[in-house]
Amino acid sequence: MRSVQAPVVCPAIRPRQVGACASLVNYTGLKPRSQFWGNRTKGVKSQGTTTTITLRLCNKSIKCVFSSHSDGNGSTAENFNENDEEYVNSSVVEAVEVKSGADGFMVKMRDGRQLRCVHNNPQGGHLPDYAPHPAIVLKMEDGTGLLLPIIVLEMPSVLLMAAMTNVQIARPTMYQVVKEMVDKMGYEVRLVRVTKRVHEAYFAQLFLSKVGNASECVSFDLRPSDAINIAVRCKIPIQVNKYLAYSDGMRVIESGKISTPAPASDGLLFTEQDRPNGQACLDTKEFNILSKMMQAVDEERYDEAAEWRDKLGQFRAKRNLRKYT
């Protein structure tokens, strides 16, 4: 990403000839990729980048100049443009999970609404059925209203909702730690971009710039869930590659509340609430498990939180199985 020019002195190396000419060494190495927070993908071919090292022998020392002009896609972090026409601004919607089934592709919102969606791309084909998964959903702010759902792990989704609703967590999360580290190193977070999709995995980039010198920029490859969590806490723009937005985006065709069948009217209001039916409320059970998981995380009882997370997954799987059988 960046061009590094610094002398490297190796006094133990003695040139055979005094005043030797500069020699060029070309090699092709694997493109350096940050495995930030375990960002690993399977089935992705590593890209190569050609790097030139110039060695100058002078007074029994070697001066090495490293120059890398591209990050593999023809753009450098120093030259990134926040108004790039290839990207569209987006915002995070308060969605908690997505699923695909007989009713189509559904997005469950934090307030209980269910959004039924269809592919924006007519050639997107029929989505396979799958159980509810935690997700982060981005809404395009270019007037189209397209949604880009990104399936993530449970914890990044929960922490994102906590940040969006200003829920205070007793101990700093890793996203808060990263934000403070960036500040103390004299940088500021500028922008997050969802750049591409490889097979079923989305990729994102986090752009930083030196405080007081916006032209000095660096960028990191991150998982979208991590990049978006940082963006929300730093209150910076989140952009999506236009091709991804229009090819993978979903259009909302129906929006409504979760409704339960009302009993026959007998002239009294709220009869269903006044007389419990004696059956356990599955939503209440799910909420209680989720609440206990969050409480364990808040109190740093991570082993217990992992157990509640597993119980939550098992509960949701049984609930969905019961729904379709």
UniProtKB/Swiss-Prot annotation:
Gene Ontology cellular component annotations, sorted alphabetically: nucleus
Every UVR domain range: 284-318
Domain BFN residues, every copy: 117-252
UniProt-listed GO biological process terms: defense response to fungus
Effects seen without this gene: Increased susceptibility to fungal pathogens.
Induction remarks: Up-regulated by pathogens, abscisic acid, etephon, salicylic acid and methyl jasmonate.
Subcellular location(s) of the protein: Nucleus
Endpoints of the signal sequence: none
Primary localisation category: nucleus
The entry's keywords: Hydrolase, Nuclease, Nucleus
One Gene Ontology MF term: nuclease activity
EC number: 3.1.-.-
Endoplasmic reticulum among keywords: no
Family matches, as InterPro entries: BFN_sf (IPR036104), Bi_nuclease_dom (IPR003729), UVR_dom (IPR001943)
Function: Bifunctional nuclease with both RNase and DNase activities. Involved in basal defense response. Participates in abscisic acid-derived callose deposition following infection by a necrotrophic pathogen.
Similarity section: Belongs to the bifunctional nuclease family.
This protein's name: Bifunctional nuclease 1
Organism from which the protein derives: Arabidopsis thaliana
Organism classification: Eukaryota, Viridiplantae, Streptophyta, Embryophyta, Tracheophyta
Gene encoding the protein: BBD1
